[in-house]
Structure formats: structure tokens, C-alpha cells
Amino acid sequence: MAEEPRAPEALSSTFMLNMTSDASVRRIVRRIGTLARRRVQQLPDMETFSPEFDPELSEPPFLPFSAYVITGTAGAGKSTSVSCLHHTMDCLVTGATTVAAQNLSQTLRAYCPTVYSAFGFKSRHINMTQRVSSHGRSTDAALEELQRRDLAKYWPVLSDIAAEFRRTKPRGLYSGVSGPAFEVLRDMHQGQLWTTNVIVVDEAGTLSVHILTAVVFCYWFFNAWLRTPLYRRGRIPCIVCVGSPTQTDAFQSSFSHETQVNKIRECDNILTFLVGNPRAATYVDVARNWALFINNKRCTDVQFGHLMKTLEYGLELSPDILAYVDRFVVPRAAIMDPAQYVGWTRLFLSHAEVKTFLTTLHATLKTAGQGRAARGTGGDGGGVTMFTCPVECEVFLDPLAQYKTLVGLPGLTAHTWLQKNYARLGNYSQFADQDMVPVGTEQDEERVKVTYNVTYVKHSSVSVNCKTKKSICGYTGTFGDFMDTLEADSFVEAHGHEQPEYVYSFLARLIYGGIYAFSHGGHSLCENGEYVAELGAVPLPGRTWDPEVTAGMELGELPLEVAWDGERSPAAVFYARVLAPPAANSAPLCSLLNIYNDLRAYFRQCLDVAVRYGGREFRDLPFCTFTNNMLIRDNIEFTSDEPLLHGLLDYASTTENYTLLGYTHLNVFFGIRGKQQPQDAGSSRMPRLMVKDEAGFVCCLEHNTNKLYETIEDKSLNLCSIRDYGISSKLAMTIAKAQGLSLNKVAICFGSHRNIKPGHVYVALSRARHSNCVVMDRNPLSEMITGEGNPASGYIVDALKNSRALLVY
């Protein structure tokens, strides 16, 4: 009898919510396409912006632009529209922050720069002082005056970018290139401001208004200088601004060199400017060019979604909503107790609170470890291992002497400068939150070097702060998970797009080294004679390998100093007869693929034998393998008899969770594949951190080096260099840093802060994936006055009533 067809499984709520957005997202794409085709009749005269020009003193031409605004509640699917834009039209997708940019890169599987990188911003521009303009100060100032104000304010940076562009790009480079030929050239390279007029900016609510003007200026200047078809046709730039004006704020810092004080103040962000300024809103026709995403699709809890919409739109906080939020409140002592809510991310409002919590956590773990040691039950803090690594900060004396003369502070010493600028350095190099104490000072004729010790917890979750290189050198997990990864080819898909030969060579090395675990993995099957016999009967790989390849392979290329105890174990036979996989640059891709497939098949057969004798439970046994013969000293230091750690190069993602495993002093490849990067001067005492990614692969992280420049009277002085590890603990972070991240479980501590904004509550709550994964020490919403909130909420409510605005459910 024929089997009846099975009823289709019910579709998930998340899938249904995403599908309801499909038609509206298509409308967004069509509308942006229409804006992208707009042209200007009178081209702006970019010759005005000569090296001698100053918009504060002379009136610049108006630079036309169009804009499309995409806002919505947290997790509502705004990035869905960005993905559709990326796949359906030529556009430059950028993020306002590094986290936003790498989040987009991960989602789109394509490189997405920050908006600052897109218009040519470099590290030397960070400390260039922004000017105060006398233009555009009145409340009814025209858009031309507002644009001139922003140009004058940011002109020290923009003029330097323009000067560098003139030096590095030939003038009129594309003047003789036709439109079709230019499109071919454009498709061969990554998007730039001179290859497309559609620029997408994610998390635009964190950017000050002058960044919008900077993007528009650089678009017109770059295209005019190169004489691209975009400029010759008069194509107007279309800036697609994505984010939430109620979730985020833009801040501007100003540093006084005379007092050595850094002041930070809030300023208008791009989204609020476009939807709230009457002249800007009219110019870009925001009523027609605005899409609002309504439903939270990250967390499908109806009440939680209603809370998000209430905060997004600044609606009245009803007693029911306040009672719902009260459900999340727990005693503050419970949140501050490291022994409770283990594995949850603590969120605070200030860096000082984060640092205090981490210091308390480390002290608690250390005390627990000492107690266990005194009782003779182990001294690792209950299974927790802590370690310290040095961080180096160098102040250069010659630039400091010039700086003191220029700012009129002859008595300023290196130690005083470092003390007064420590907060700036911490934020600059992203180590402000860490449990770090000074341990030593060295001085010579050129520099003063201060060394700090930063404390880390093994197996804690960390995130990467910046664009950091990683060398993938091993795997740790289970036998079954490793086999599933090989079978699914997920690693190859994620890393093998540019140079797959390196990926296959790397995986072949891991499999080759991992065969040892079947015979000497410390499991009970090692003593089973029948298992050992059948494992030894598995046909060895390598018989079909290309003779030209195997001729260049030598035994011991991948040294595995294993004590065989005089036995001819299956592993001993394997390593005696099967040659180590060749390096990626010494064999053709087809041969490397053949070797990888043979080794993978052999590993699968060995695992099948182990499962037959050990049951399905064998798949869950611990398994680890490395490209080197790795030893772990004191449970924390990765070392090897080889001086160089072999690995696969890639960039670490700021949006991915990494588990901290320890550190290594081995030399590591971080330069071009096949070439060793020279050791940084002065970094010999700094180890490199070892982490595990979400898939189980072990990576070695490159050091993070930042150089702090001060620009005084057109002189750029490199005063300081900071070398750290470029990571932050996910045990605790500020609410501002959490913006754009999806955290599994969050414990929020608002402390005794006053004047907490609804946006703080909004961002903190919306980081969780489920309403059951949120706790906080108090409910700030119950303390807020009715109607208090972000002014942008009023503009959003007006848009909801506007039939021309697009609502995406």
C-alpha cells in the first residue's frame, strides 16, 4: 500500500513575518532606483574647491543630493531591504561603525566598509579639530547655509582627503571611457564613491549631520576629478540612510589642548536631521521617501514587540506596559554578583561600571580558586582559569616636545600627558572597559613605555573591536561536529571564495593531524583489540594521488612526535605510510582537492568504526587537532616544537562570538600568504591570543596597534602608540557598545543614574533574542515623565499618519 503524503510542516512565525515584508521591500527598491536615475541640469563647479578654498570664507556651490530613509523597531528587518538593494542594483553598502559594517559583510557575504573608509577617512584625521562655523546658525537657515556650515566645520578633514585624492588619482582618468565600458570596469572592482551614486549607510542614527555632507561632497569631488560618466551625466547621489533615530544618538567630542580636557556633547544625527529639519525634509521629500518597518522579527513575543513599538514611537507608557517591564526587575545585588546569571552579558551605562564589574568578577574567581586550593580541591576557581597579558603604551618624546611648544604647555611631561589622556586612549584603542593595571615603566631617549597587565578569563566570551587578522590553526569540539563540518562544506563555503587551494590544504592538514585521536585519544576503545584491528583494516588514503605531487612530499613535513610505545598502532601505520599534505603553493588545486577528499573519506571510515564499537556516544567525545604538533602548557599557553605556527589567514568578525582559550608566543603568519610578517618592534613580550570561533575552529589573533596623532597648526604629530589585543569581554559592556549586536541573554544594570533616556532602555532590552532572557535592576520607564523622549518619535508618529510614507509590517 502506497504511503500517504505527509502534511507539510507549519511555517515558523519568523518566516511568515519576513514574507509579509516582501512586497513592500520591492517597492523600496523601485523607489530608490527612481531616485538613482535623477540628474542635475547644472553641474556643480567643483573647480571652486581648490587647495586654497575655505568654505568659511567663500561661498561654495550647493551640492545636490537625494535621500531615502529606512527606519523601524529593533529587529524589524531593516537589513532585509539592504540585502535586496545589494542584490538588485549597483550600490555601495557601508556601516556607520565597524560593528555595523562587519554585520553587513556577514549578512551579504561581501565586503562592506565603514562610511568613513568609503570617503577616505584615515587614522590621522581622528584628532583633527572640527571648527565652529558662523554660518547656518539661525533656526530658519536655508539648506544651502546648513551645507556650508557642515563643510566649514569639517573642512580640515575634507581638504586633506581632497589633497590626497589629487596626489594619488590622475585627473580625468575616466574622461575618455564610455558608459558601457565604465560599467564593465565597475563590475571588476569593489564599490567606490566614483563607481555608483547609490550609497547605503547602516546605523545612520549614530552619525553627526556633517558626515552626510562629507559623503555628498566626496561623491561630487571624486567623480568630477576623475571625469566619470556619473559626473558627465549629472547623476545625483542617492544616500540611503538606515537605522532608528530613537534608538541611537550622535555625539561629538572636542579636545582642549590648553586644558587637556576632552568634552563630549550630543549633536543632531543624520536621521533626525532628514525627518525633523523642515528644509531638509522638504528638499528630500521625506514624506514620500521614507519606509518604516513596524514588527520586531527578532523576538516574536507579542508583548515584547508591542513594548519595542511603544518606545520607538514615543507612545504613552500605559500601566500594562509598565507592569510588563516590571517583570524583568531583579535585585541589583543579583546582577552584580558574578556567581549569578552566569553566561549572561551585563550591560551598563558607563565604562567605569563595566570595568568595576570585571574587576570584581576577577577578584571573586581568584578568591574562589585560592579557597579550593586551600581545601586541596584544585586551585582553578572552580574550573575557571585566569591569566594576564601585557599591553604596551608608548609616548614619543620628540613629538611631545613639539606638541608642548605648540600648545603652550612647557611643563607637560610624558607621564602627565598619559594620565590626562588615558580615557581618550582607552576609547581610541577600545581597552577602556578592561581590568588593566600598570606594572612597569621604561624610558630611553626616544620614548616612554608604560606596560599594563590585563586580566582575562579562559573560556569567556569575547568580541573583536576592530579589523583584526586571524590565523586559523586548529579545531576543538567533538568527533561528530568535526565530521559534520567537513561533510557540509560550510567551512569551504565561508573561506574558499578567493583562494580555495589554501582552504583545502588547511583542512587536509587538520584531518591528517586528527587521525591520531582514533588510536591515542584517551578513550576506552584504545584498549579494545577488535576495535584496533578493524581500525587498522581501513584502507589507507593516498593511492590515487598524483605522482608528481607525492614526489615532492616528504615524511615529517608535519612533525608529530608521538610515542608509539613500541606498538604498530593504526595511527603509527598511518603516519608511516601516508605522506603529509603538501603546502597550498606546491600543488595544483585539483591535486589538493583530491587529497582532501581522500583524507575526509578515511576520517569518515575511522569514525564509522569507532561508532560501531563505542556507540553514537563516541561522536560526542572531545576532539581536537592542529596544523602543528601543539602542546598546551599550564592549561593556557599553546606551544610547539616548531617555531612557526601554520594557519589559514582571514579577518576576525566583530559580530561573531569568540571563546578565549589562552595565548601563544609562537611566530605566526599575518602577512601575504606565504610571506612572514616581520615582528613588531617592542612586541616580543606580548603573546598572541588564541580563541575559538562559533564553529569550533581555533584562531590566533593579530595584535591591535593604534597610533594616536594630534594635528596642531597643520602639523600632524604621532604622540603615542598603543599595542593591545583588540578584544572586549562579552561578560560586560556598555549599552552604547551593544548597539547593533544580538546578545543571547542580558542583565541590565542602570545603577543610580538619573535622566536615563528611553533610547537607553530601548537598546538594552532589544539586544535579547527572547523576553525570557532579560533582567534589569530597576524600571526607568516608570520614572519618566509622560511625553518625555526623543523628539524624533513625534516625526515618526506623523509619518505613520501620512499615506505617502511606506509602512512595512
Swiss-Prot record:
Keyword Hydrolase assigned: yes
Gene Ontology cellular-component annotations: host cell nucleus
Keyword Hydrolase appears in the UniProt entry: yes
Subcellular location field: Host nucleus
EC number: 3.6.4.-
InterPro entries associated with the record: DNA_helicase_dom, HSV_HELI, P-loop_NTPase
Residues that, per the record, bind ATP: G72, T73, A74, G75, A76, G77, K78, S79
CDD domains registered for this protein in UniProt: SF1_C_RecD
TM ranges: none
Keywords annotated in UniProt: ATP-binding, DNA replication, Helicase, Host nucleus, Hydrolase, Nucleotide-binding
Pfam families in UniProt: Herpes_Helicase (PF02689)
Subunit-structure text: Associates with the primase and the primase-associated factor to form the helicase-primase complex.
Known function: Component of the helicase/primase complex. Unwinds the DNA at the replication forks and generates single-stranded DNA for both leading and lagging strand synthesis. The primase synthesizes short RNA primers on the lagging strand that the polymerase elongates using dNTPs. Possesses helicase-like motifs and therefore may act as the helicase subunit of the complex.
HAMAP family: HSV_HELI (MF_04030)
Annotated protein name in UniProt: DNA replication helicase
Gene that encodes the chain: HELI
